[in-house]
Amino acid sequence: MRRYETIFIADPDLSPENQAQLFEKATTLIDANSGVLVEFDEWGTRRLAYEIRKKPRGHYVRLDFCGDGATVQGLENAFRIDERVLKFMTVFLSENADPEALRQAIAEEKEKKAEGQAAADAAPADGDDEAPKQPAPASDDDAPKQPETEAGSDETEAAAADKSDDNA
């Protein structure tokens, strides 16, 4: 199976029930067209770079799925017809993808991230292990200046002499 990623922008003015219905429709379309949903990632409402249908904001959703061309075509056709979808884009990710292996890898990654977050939350609670913080210099003027040496100019003169010998 091929792996695809579709990001679509839904109308931000939709009620939560209507949003849930749209998201359910997208996931069932993938299943109906012999596809397998790997990950459903809701990014939330964000400001658009430019207005789409006179709306400055949009609700972003990312679908990671495996399927074939018919799966992508069915999903995109439904998005073109549905007025609740402002924009969408599908990208091909890989040729031979195993949906179960991808799900396991994503689950493991989320576990590691959760463990790392839990460790990060626990570390500031101790507070005694941290080194005292020193202020950084405000600008380059405060930094100590290195005296300029003439060694750099000798090197450039030697390089120029070598170059002139090569040309002669």
UniProtKB/Swiss-Prot annotation:
Residues 103-168 are annotated as: Disordered. One of its GO terms (molecular function) is small ribosomal subunit rRNA binding. Binds together with bS18 to 16S ribosomal RNA. GO terms for biological process: translation. The gene is rpsF. Residues 116-125 have a biased composition (Low complexity). Pfam families: Ribosomal_S6 (PF01250). It comes from Desulfosudis oleivorans (strain DSM 6200 / JCM 39069 / Hxd3) (Desulfococcus oleovorans). This is Small ribosomal subunit protein bS6. The keyword RNA-binding applies. Residues 106-115 have a biased composition (Basic and acidic residues). NCBIfam families: S6. Gene3D superfamilies: 3.30.70.60. One of its GO terms (cellular component) is cytoplasm. Belongs to the bacterial ribosomal protein bS6 family. HAMAP family: Ribosomal_bS6. Keywords: Ribonucleoprotein, Ribosomal protein, RNA-binding, rRNA-binding.
